[in-house]
Amino acid sequence: MEKKQRKQLVIQMLTAGIITFCLLWLLFYIKKYVPFGVHSLASKDADFQYLDFLAYLKDVFDGKNNIDYSFSKSIGGACIGVFSYYLSSPFILLLLLFDKSQLVLFVHVIITLKLACAAATFAFYLNRRFEEWNDGSVKKQALIIFLAVSYAVSQYGIAQACNIMWLDGFYMLPLIMLGVYRVVNGGRPVMLSVSVALAVLFNWYMGGINCVFACFWFLFEFAYSRLYSGDTKAEKTVIKDFAGKLGRFIYSMLAGVLISGVLFLPTIGAMRYSVRGSLDLGSLLDMSFIGGVSSVIDGYSLGAQSQKGSVSLY
């Protein structure tokens, strides 16, 4: 990448992130959210659970509790599962700068930072994925910034503000998508492996969801590359090409998951002894449909939320 292109990329990422950050804080000011009022995005589970977990982690930082085992967890228990699901985001380190009385403000700060980061990573994805299309013109740079901000403040990003740990997967997804694109088009698999590893480390649940999405995105990118490459190879050659790229994709994904094993494996071990719930594998074979097919279409309306019989997909 030339120096001018790198400069444009940095400007696009910073501009998209700053616009998103300022836009969200402007809305907080207008709607009187903390610190400008009494309203809070820490609602539902964030109010019932996450604030308590943040208070626990603040005690850990202050040397008043243990990250591995805590008596504040029910009657006492290992906390590695709680940490890896709720508290392993790199943004959580900013908690060191806040007091316990400022936890709601802290939640608002990391929400805006994570969504700003999502805008920056999506701008990075658009710039590198459509490199041939991006000629550096002001019009196309503005379009990249607009689309990046739109991604960050989409309904999913705003709706999941009360699930702050899920937003890490939101800003990591564009990097995984770019990694898939590079694997399909003969690039190095490092970006995909590292992105998957970080996504799982930051939140294993959303990291897993991103991995599932990556499988579908691989199929899309391969089909796109075949349709628009103008290549007229025989069917057997296409199958061989698909098998080779699929192998590189699987290898890259597995490498990422293995890297994340430093935290993921202890989490699995902790979950094995959890009595909070169980998985019925037989239910995976149940192909019944809850609700009507039309409810999926209704779920795309502005402000729609998922409920039993009516799913809102993103």
Predicted regions and their residues:
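Membrane-interfacial, low-structure loops and terminal tails that flank and connect transmembrane helices
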Residues: 1-6, 133-137, 225-245
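Periplasmic/ER-lumenal interhelical loops and adjacent helix-loop junctions
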Residues: 44-61, 90, 245-246, 253-314
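Juxtamembrane loop-helix boundary motifs flanking transmembrane segments in multi-pass membrane proteins
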Residues: 46, 82, 101, 189-190, ...
